[in-house]
A protein has these predicted regions:
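N-terminal binding-site loop/beta-alpha segment at the start of enzyme catalytic domains
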Residues: 1-76
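Acidic (Asp/Glu)-rich catalytic clusters
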Residues: 5-11, 63-75, 94-104, 124-130, ...
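Beta/alpha (TIM)-barrel catalytic core signal, keyed to glycine-rich beta->alpha loops juxtaposed to Asp/Glu
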Residues: 113-193
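A structural motif
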Residues: 46, 103-106, 133, 158
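Short, acidic/polar
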Residues: 26-42, 86-102, 119, 143-153
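Conserved, mostly hydrophobic/aromatic
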Residues: 4, 16, 41, 49, ...
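Active-site mouth loops of central-metabolism enzymes
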Residues: 19-32, 79-88, 113, 139
Length: 193
């Protein structure tokens, strides 16, 4: 487990992303297989599960799996994203994600690939104050917009950043990781392999 905030809260260092793998539609047999995968993940100490409205049916399948595994799952650290260029749709996506997952509170809500981040950050801050979100994050991948992401880390009240980091793509080591360390922002590596 790794400490990630001033609260002393800890998370396993390996999480589960749901892009492609949980976008299985309404096929019950496949949904049940994903439920088994999620159950095994929790049983073996996993916690962070990351999704997005961009991932097709993934959030709906997660809600299905969580219903069958029993609620609450004590080790679940729920993470999803808002992903729309239209500020008015952001609030709808947030409400829809709560319904699909069957959660009243998300542990982490992120702005996907910095899309309309200025507006969505305000919306997420309001939700954090209301208690429907515990932590706020921003994401990017494939080395895009690193300069902008660094500025956000340095100037905005965020708790997490999610970015591409692996043996072949180590660009973030130069500026983004040091900025996150300096500001106390937790880092989630996507595409680690």
């Amino acid at each position: 487990l790794k400490k990630f905030s001033d609260t002393g809260e800890r998370l396993p260092v390996i999480g589960m992303g749901t892009w492609i793998t949980f976008n299985v539609g309404n096929i019950i047999q496949t949904r049940n297989q994903r439920t088994q995968v999620l159950g095994t993940f929790f049983k073996l100490g996993g916690g962070l599960v990351d999704s997005s409205p961009m991932y097709g049916s993934a959030e709906e399948v997660l809600g299905y799996a969580l219903d069958r595994l029993g609620r609450p799952q004590p080790s679940l650290f729920s993470a999803t994203k808002v992903w729309t260029p239209f500020p008015s749709r952001g609030e709808w996506q947030i409400e829809e994600s709560h319904k699909l997952w069957g959660l009243q509170q998300f542990d982490l809500y992120q702005i996907h690939n910095l899309v309309a981040w200025e507006h969505h950050l305000q919306t997420l801050q309001q939700h954090k104050q209301e208690g429907t979100i515990r932590y706020i994050g921003v994401t990017t991948s494939h080395g895009r917009r690193h300069q902008e992401l660094e500025q956000i880390i340095q100037t905005q009240p965020i708790d997490f950043v999610q970015l591409t980091y692996n043996i072949l793509d180590r660009e973030v080591e130069r500026r983004l990781l040091p900025a996150a360390i300096e500001k106390g922002v937790a880092v989630i590596a996507n595409r680690p392999f």
